[in-house]
């Protein structure tokens, strides 16, 4: 009878005190996310301004995302307020919970303290993970919900607890209500299930009950989509054609290595080998196949968004931690443990400045040029990486619009609306508008188009982000009155001419539908 390595002798009913190392790493993750907020040179991220607008208008769906994240943000705004710290606290906590679950998965796989700690540390310092837990969006919750699914699947496989499929269905349903692309994870898991001995669970009533629960949870969003002409499908189609960069399979793989910390690549690759080839991980082959199906889908789609697979890495880090720990136990234990964990940590430190707002913008420009992070969107250029550039210039934009508004004759006051090209501009003007006495804002972009259709017609519009040619197609009188400039924002948000538009050629109800744009921040 084979003996188990010391790395696998872990009592699964161990008290919380035995997982102190995981609590400490989770706390470390929270500190990584929140302490950089002391750097006041970076403000709200573009999407945060939009999500706060969505949270003010709760619905069962939005053009570019499902409803869960705005619902949760509404609770945050009610209880904690809308400061940068308040709205980023929950993403940081979701990230910490994901780190804790990563180590817990390693524990369920049979890993000891080092295996669990290595897995959790690798996840905590991964650049992509740091980026997407650093501002409010769907991404931190996607990672948490899917990692929770993986944890439950490991328990189902190892402990033969089929009733847990109902909880998997609950988390999948919530995941789909948070981000539609979780369907790719669910389908990959389902296909892997059919190709492994775990397929016997398909005959379990608990499996189908979980599936029914997932469908029931996401049903309100499906109804909203039908009522709104499948708006999200139009958004995804346009984003795929005009936003994402065509990427070769090799570039897709290299981007995965980059965003998950190049020095942690041996850990997650070891995790893949653990699930696919090792005797200890054979029972959990479903997880290795799930990752391969996800990666194949990314390569086939030529996706330039490496974050689309971010939620797949906790399970690989967990498996890698167990495999590496078993290898280390048979050799110079303490030395190898220090070298391996140290390498992962060094990689995290090296890439942290392009993931967290710790450097002043001027220094960050130079650092980013040295590391050259992958480009993820067409036409999206700036001196800073996009996830930092889109945290600058928004309040200055509101101030620029306020200056233009002061040029209007008194007789036009009260009959003015703002017209912004994209949801970032519209969200910024709506959020900072009261501070500068600005009127309501319209935008033809994504869900703002639906909201704006309910507005009354104005006599005068102050427009930003749209071209003079496009505006003259709608208004007879288009006058440039100012320019908005920002130093570190995205190029397409810099040097924007501000126009005052009057005398619409047709009534609002006729020209507004033609301006609709579902897709990325720019049409081209």
Predicted regions and their residues:
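Short hydrophobic alpha-helices at membrane interfaces in multi-pass membrane enzymes
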Residues: 152-173, 204, 208, 212, ...
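Short helix- or helix-capping micro-motifs
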Residues: 26-29, 119-127, 172, 176, ...
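Transmembrane-helix signature of polytopic, membrane-embedded enzymes
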Residues: 2, 20-27, 102-125, 144
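Membrane-interface transmembrane helices that cradle and orient dolichyl/undecaprenyl
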Residues: 107, 149-165, 271-280
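Membrane-interface alpha helices of multi-pass inner-membrane proteins
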Residues: 57, 164-179, 214-215, 293-299
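Transmembrane-helix motifs of polytopic, lipid-linked glycan transferases
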Residues: 89-110, 148, 152
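Transmembrane-lumen/periplasm boundary regions of multi-pass, lipid-linked membrane glycan transferases
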Residues: 183-284, 302, 353-357
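Short acidic/glycine- and proline-prone juxtamembrane loop motifs at membrane-interface regions
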Residues: 128, 134-142
């Amino acid at each position: 009878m084979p003996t188990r390595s010391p790395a696998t002798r872990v009592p699964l009913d161990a008290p919380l005190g035995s997982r102190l190392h995981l609590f400490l790493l989770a706390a470390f993750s929270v500190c990584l996310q929140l302490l950089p907020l002391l750097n006041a040179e970076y403000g709200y991220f573009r999407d945060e301004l939009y999500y706060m607008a969505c949270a003010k208008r709760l619905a069962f769906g939005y053009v570019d995302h499902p409803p869960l994240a705005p619902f949760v943000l509404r609770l945050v705004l009610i209880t904690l307020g809308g400061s940068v710290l308040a709205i980023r606290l929950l993403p940081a906590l979701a990230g910490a919970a994901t780190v804790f679950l990563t180590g817990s998965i390693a524990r369920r796989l049979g890993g000891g303290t080092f295996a669990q700690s290595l897995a959790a540390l690798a996840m905590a310092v991964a650049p992509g993970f740091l980026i997407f837990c650093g501002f409010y969006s769907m991404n931190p919750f996607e990672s948490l919900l899917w990692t929770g699914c993986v944890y439950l699947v490991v328990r189902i496989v190892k402990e033969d607890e089929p009733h847990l499929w109902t909880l998997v269905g609950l988390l999948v349903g919530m995941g789909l209500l948070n981000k539609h692309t979780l369907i790719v994870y669910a389908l990959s898991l389902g296909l892997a299930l059919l190709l492994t001995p775990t397929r016997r669970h398909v005959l379990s009533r608990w499996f189908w009950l979980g599936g029914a629960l997932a469908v029931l949870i996401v049903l309100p969003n499906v109804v909203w989509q039908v009522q709104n002409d499948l708006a999200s499908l139009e958004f995804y189609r346009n984003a795929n054609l005009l936003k994402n960069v065509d990427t070769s399979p090799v570039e897709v793989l290299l981007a995965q290595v980059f965003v998950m910390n190049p020095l942690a690549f041996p850990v997650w690759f070891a995790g893949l080998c653990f699930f696919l080839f090792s005797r200890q991980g054979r029972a959990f082959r479903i997880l290795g196949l799930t990752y391969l199906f996800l990666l194949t889908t990314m390569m086939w789609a030529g996706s330039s968004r490496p974050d689309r697979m971010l939620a797949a890495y906790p399970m690989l880090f967990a498996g890698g931690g167990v495999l590496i720990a078993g290898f280390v136990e048979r050799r110079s234990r303490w030395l190898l443990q220090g070298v391996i964990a140290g390498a992962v940590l060094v990689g995290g430190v090296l890439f942290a400045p392009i993931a967290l707002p710790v450097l002043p913008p001027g220094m960050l420009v130079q650092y980013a040029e040295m590391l050259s992070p992958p480009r993820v969107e067409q036409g999206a250029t700036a001196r800073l990486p996009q996830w930092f550039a889109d945290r600058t210039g928004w309040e200055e934009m509101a101030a620029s619009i306020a200056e233009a508004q002061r040029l209007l004759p008194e007789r036009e006051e009260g009959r003015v609306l703002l017209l912004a090209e994209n949801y970032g501009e519209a969200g910024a003007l709506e959020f900072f508008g009261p501070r500068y006495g600005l009127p309501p804002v319209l935008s033809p972009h994504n869900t703002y188009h639906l909201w704006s259709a309910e507005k009354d017609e104005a006599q005068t519009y102050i427009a930003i982000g749209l071209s003079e040619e496009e505006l003259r197609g709608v208004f007879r009188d288009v006058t440039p009155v100012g320019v908005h400039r920002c130093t570190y924002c995205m190029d397409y948000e810099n040097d924007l001419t501000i126009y005052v538009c009057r005398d619409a050629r047709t009534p609002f109800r006729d020209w507004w539908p033609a301006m609709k744009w579902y897709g990325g921040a720019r049409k081209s």
